[in-house]
Design a protein with these regions (language model features):
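Glycine-rich, small/hydroxylated-residue low-complexity segments
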Residues: 1-225
Length: 225
């Protein structure tokens, strides 16, 4: 399979599941589902991007939400090595060699890609519950390494990973989420919860909005606010 630049989109206006027992997990409706997957590359690098949106979702015993958006992008991958990896996957079922040998070739190809390092980001993510909202952004990178096995990659991952995350959410989303889950808090109880979260996450508070910043580098996490 030759890597091609372009996009694939899937749009579904409505999905509804109704069980005889309306309290069955999964019963409900999803509206305005959109999924987009894209590939971008130049002469030496390739990147992949996924975007998902849900206009509204209402399921039994799960707090309903709307205007859900989630995005994730991986970039600066070695184009030739990614192509080789997909070629191995395609040949895997037709290969006349031992399964263990095929799996090892695929693993080695995967490690070769990761060892070159890459960058990633997840921007403009959001969700709304009632009039409340939450937003999140993430940027980071995996630094180059020299891992020869999956075990060593897992072991070294904390020192190879760097990221910065920013989360913003308001008082109303917590109140609405708890109410839809069947739990009602007084304004005083909700305020105590927010104060506790502010201290635990070292969050910055602006009125009814909490902002949390996290940086992870050299295997250590620190709060930025």
């Amino acid at each position: 399979t030759v890597l091609n630049e372009g996009e694939t989109r899937l749009n579904i206006a409505s999905i509804q599941r109704t069980d005889r027992n309306v309290q069955q997990f999964g019963s409900g409706e999803l509206k305005g589902f959109a999924l987009q997957v894209g590939t971008q590359f130049d002469k030496t690098k390739v990147g992949f991007e996924t975007q998902m949106k849900i206009a509204e979702m209402n399921l039994h015993n799960i707090p309903g939400f709307r205007d859900f958006e989630m995005n994730f992008k991986v970039a600066s991958l070695n184009r030739q090595k990614v192509q080789d990896f997909f070629d191995l996957l395609e040949k895997n079922s037709a290969a006349c060699v031992a399964k263990e040998e095929r799996n090892q070739d695929i693993l080695n190809s995967f490690l070769s890609i990761v060892n070159d390092g890459f960058v990633f980001e997840s921007q403009n993510n959001q969700i709304k519950v009632g009039e409340g909202y939450a937003k999140a952004n993430l940027t980071g990178r995996v630094m180059p390494g020299h891992q020869s096995s999956l075990e060593s990659l897992v072991k070294m991952a904390p020192s190879l990973l760097e990221y910065q995350a920013n989360l913003e959410y308001d008082k109303q989303i917590m109140k609405n989420y708890l109410q839809q889950g069947g739990k009602t808090l007084s304004d005083q109880e909700l305020e105590q919860m927010l104060n506790s979260m502010q201290q635990t996450l070292q969050a910055k508070r602006e009125g009814d909005i909490l902002k949390v910043g996290i940086e992870y580098k050299y295997g250590e996490k620190k709060f930025l606010n």
